[in-house]
């Protein structure tokens, strides 16, 4: 029997990972057999790596992304009617929250309703985010329209988000010099910053100001009429989308002022409760979301593209944050984030099952964290700077606050955060 043509490239061992002892033993057994036996072993290895029911042991090599994606393909069915219903329901919730923010007799109730409007704005943004990935419906043209509609309350220009998020963030997650979202400075970079930028970095990473980070560093500098410093080459569609959200904001503010006059209320108060509070709550909500998606002492950043690509970044750079009381579902399952990075075509209503499948198939590989404020502020305390040379997080004094990642493909189970002294 001729020797098999070989195992498909999608299931070959990454070059950075030496075969574990068990694999070496299997190889030695296969080598002692005839050529036909060797072919049989090769095919069995291929079948094992492509098997969507047998979990991959933590010491085995990470399967190719194509293999991993094949496990969750069944959860990628997109339904137009379901997606439109989600959008309509969230807009109805938004109108109800705005009604409370503008018409409730109590100022406190107005503020609470304004915060609720900010939360629903976040839900609508997640729908738009799916549309921007072309994962909301199977119709690309419809996705572009629905995405722009869903992005209006958050004042997000669709085309600019598409480039910054889909191309840059998803294409180069946690790769220094490419991915800019919550990218940590190295100790040398931080030392070279101006006093103002050092102050801002400390404020952003204090745990108390994720909304300020999103408002300034993402929305203002990179989304809303960005300059060439942050945008590079411009396209007419960028300006059109910026004008679209600007027009929506003008109509929104004008309607609030008109309602204030019609109901004999303070225009300033209603602008605060019906415009400022919802927008700031939305910025805080999503600044928090994008921070916790990729920041944890067990998650690395990389400066070398080759090294980065060997770490299976679509799995190793993301965190699945779980919540009680169905909060994850209220956020349209955006926290099932590993599944989203493995396959961006999975719609939001398929992410929960897709994430569960990945965690069943890759035990010990995925960072899963139950949310608590203790964990959040401990992460904020540890994850100030990232030392590329030592491959660990540090505080602002350069003291390590996480284990060094000694192996590029080390399982998450071996990468435990360590205690570190608090900042002075």
Feature annotation, model-predicted:
Residues 69-78, 231, 354:
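Cytosolic juxtamembrane amphipathic/interface segments immediately preceding
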Residues 77-124, 154-156, 201-218, 234-289:
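Alpha-helical bilayer-embedded segments of polytopic membrane proteins, i.e.
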Residues 29, 33-47:
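Short, Lys/Arg-enriched N-terminal segments with co-localized hydrophobic residues
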Residues 121-128, 132-242, 298-384, 388:
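Membrane-embedded catalytic scaffold of the fatty acid hydroxylase/desaturase
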Residues 42-67, 209-222:
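Short, charged cytosolic
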Residues 383-424:
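C-terminal regulatory/interaction regions
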Residues 53, 71-73, 297-301, 353, ...:
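Polar-ligand-bearing catalytic/cofactor-coordination segments
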Residues 5-31:
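Conserved beta-strand-loop-alpha-helix hinge in the C-terminal portion
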């Amino acid at each position: 029997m001729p020797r098999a043509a070989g195992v498909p490239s999608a299931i070959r061992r990454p070059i950075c990972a030496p075969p574990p002892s068990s694999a070496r033993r299997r190889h030695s057994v296969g080598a002692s057999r005839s050529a036909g036996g060797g072919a049989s072993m090769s095919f069995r290895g291929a079948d094992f790596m492509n098997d969507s029911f047998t979990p991959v042991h933590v010491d085995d090599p990470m399967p190719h992304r194509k293999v991993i994606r094949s496990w969750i393909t069944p959860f990628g069915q997109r339904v137009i009617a379901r997606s439109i219903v989600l959008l309509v329901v969230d807009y109805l919730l938004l109108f109800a929250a705005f009604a409370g923010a503008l018409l409730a007799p109590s100022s406190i109730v107005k503020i609470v309703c304004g915060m609720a409007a900010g939360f629903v704005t976040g839900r609508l943004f997640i729908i738009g985010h799916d549309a921007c990935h072309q994962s909301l419906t199977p119709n690309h043209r419809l996705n572009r329209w629905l995405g722009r509609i869903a992005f209006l309350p958050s004042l997000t220009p669709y085309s600019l988000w598409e480039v910054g998020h889909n191309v840059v963030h998803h294409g180069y997650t946690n790769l220094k010099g490419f991915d800019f979202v919550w990218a940590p400075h190295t100790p040398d970079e931080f030392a070279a910053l101006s006093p103002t930028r050092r102050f801002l970095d400390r404020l952003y990473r204090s745990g108390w100001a994720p909304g300020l980070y999103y408002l300034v560093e993402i929305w203002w500098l990179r989304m809303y009429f960005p300059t060439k410093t942050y945008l590079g080459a411009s396209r007419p569609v960028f300006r059109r989308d910026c004008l679209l959200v600007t027009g929506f904001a003008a109509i929104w503010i004008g309607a609030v002022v008109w309602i204030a006059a019609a109901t004999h209320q303070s225009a300033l108060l209603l602008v605060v409760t019906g415009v400022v509070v919802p927008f700031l709550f939305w910025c805080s909500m999503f600044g928090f979301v994008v921070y916790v998606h990729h920041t944890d002492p067990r998650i690395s950043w990389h400066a070398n593209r080759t090294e980065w690509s060997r770490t299976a970044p679509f799995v190793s750079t993301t965190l699945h944050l779980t919540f009680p009381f169905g909060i994850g579902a209220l956020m349209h399952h955006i926290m099932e984030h590993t599944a989203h990075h493995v396959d961006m075509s999975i719609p939001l209503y398929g992410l929960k099952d897709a994430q569960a499948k990945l965690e069943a198939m890759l035990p010990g590989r995925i960072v899963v964290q139950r949310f608590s404020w203790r964990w959040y502020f401990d992460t904020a305390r540890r994850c100030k700077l990232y030392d590329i040379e030592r491959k660990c997080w540090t505080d602002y004094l350069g003291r390590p606050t996480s284990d060094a990642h000694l192996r590029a493909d080390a399982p998450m189970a071996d990468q435990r955060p360590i205690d570190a002294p608090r900042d002075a």
